[in-house]
């Protein structure tokens, strides 16, 4: 059994000498037994209240891919040799990409040179990014999006990628 200390808290107001129910004037200080209740964030409480007040109908619900089971027919979408074009009916926002992997400073310089001279050969570039779960001494990435596979092929045949930067082909959903 855990020990805990108590302290006396003076009662506010005049003292009553009549026949009243006695209230405790002690409160616990320090560790107590049992788990301590955590406060919920206000946003979470408001969201839960809104969900109870305004339940979603099937027509207003949004579909998230993460909550759906894996569709075996769509696993080929990760294959870069996949015959699907951009605008595949099941993935209309899918676009071809190139992930450039290497030294962060080299990637930044290369991205800057691309923006100055080869802007028509790609659609968008990301900032330099890393995987957060890896160690500090890991390589960085820059992702380049294209409007079509032919644009990506033209980019790869035209642009000389500096040594030390690895090119990884793929495609991914575009976020607008």
Swiss-Prot record:
Family, similarity comment: Belongs to the papillomaviridae E8^E2C protein family.
Q: What does this protein do?
A: Plays a role in limiting the replication of viral DNA in keratinocytes. Recruits the host NCoR/SMRT complex to viral replication foci to mediate repression of both viral replication and transcription.
Q: Name one GO biological process term.
A: regulation of DNA replication
Q: What GO CC annotations are associated with the protein?
A: host cell nucleus
Predominant location: host cell
**InterPro entries, sorted:** E2/EBNA1_C_sf, Nucleotide-bd_a/b_plait_sf, Papillomavirus_E2_C
Places the protein is found: Host nucleus
Molecular function GO labels = DNA binding; DNA-binding transcription factor activity
Q: For the region Disordered, give the residue spans.
A: 1-70
Where along the chain is composition biased (Polar residues)?
18-37, 46-66
Pfam family for this entry, one = PPV_E2_C
Q: Which UniProt keywords apply?
A: Host nucleus
Record-given protein name: Protein E8^E2C
List the top taxonomic levels of the source.
Viruses, Monodnaviria, Shotokuvirae, Cossaviricota, Papovaviricetes
**Which cysteine-cysteine pairs are annotated as disulfide bonds in the entry?**
none
KW Acyltransferase (keyword) present: no
The protein's organism comes out as Human papillomavirus 28
Q: Signal sequence: where?
A: none
